[in-house]
Amino acid sequence: NMTEEEFKKELERLGISVTDEKMHQLEQFYEILIKTNKQMNLTRIVEKEEVYLKHFYDSLTLVKAYSFEGDLSLCDVGSGAGFPGIVLKIFFPNLKVTLIDALQKRINYLNEVIEALGLVGIEAVHVRAEDLARQNRKFDIVTARAVASLPKLLGWCMPLVQKNGVFLAMKGNVEEELD
């Protein structure tokens, strides 16, 4: 688990700038997540210090794989509770973010978070990845977190990745995936 102080220290170690405003946005995000989680299943991780580690910090470890600086578009596939999409948007406001999810009620929740946090240049869209790909939408970065097996994820996400773009899959255990 991770206290807010430890969280800030770890982000500095990753080279991510932390401001009071960003910490306040995370705090609001946490409150809406917990409130909404009582009505619908978004996460089984609800303990604050665990959310900071397993959802917030985990989302930001993607900076080890890719630089989010600059004018980039990002699509978060199966965004669900908003990880990593919303967390990345908070810390990299330059990103143009599209969160997609197949469930309308999750989109409603994501829109509530976006509005409460005053985020701009981010949209939550009720669409499946394969349907978005049919509309020829392309992104610099496509992220997905544990929504399916890796072969399935690749099938859904790769068509959304622009030439010279990247697909960043966040999966639990690498060994499990290789079996």
Language-model-detected regions and their locations in the chain:
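Conserved SAM-binding loop of SAM-dependent methyltransferases across substrates and taxa
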Residues: 81-94, 155
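Residue-level preference for alpha-helix termini and adjacent loops
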Residues: 17, 41-44, 50-51, 82, ...
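Mobile beta-alpha loop/short-helix "lid" or hinge segments that flank ligand
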Residues: 30, 81-86, 126-129
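Conserved glycine-centered beta->alpha loop in an early N-terminal alpha/beta scaffold
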Residues: 78
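Acidic/histidine-rich alpha-helical segments that form the ligand environment
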Residues: 75, 84-87, 102
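Class I SAM-dependent transferase core
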Residues: 2-71, 75, 106-108, 112-122
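S-adenosylmethionine
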Residues: 95-98, 102-179
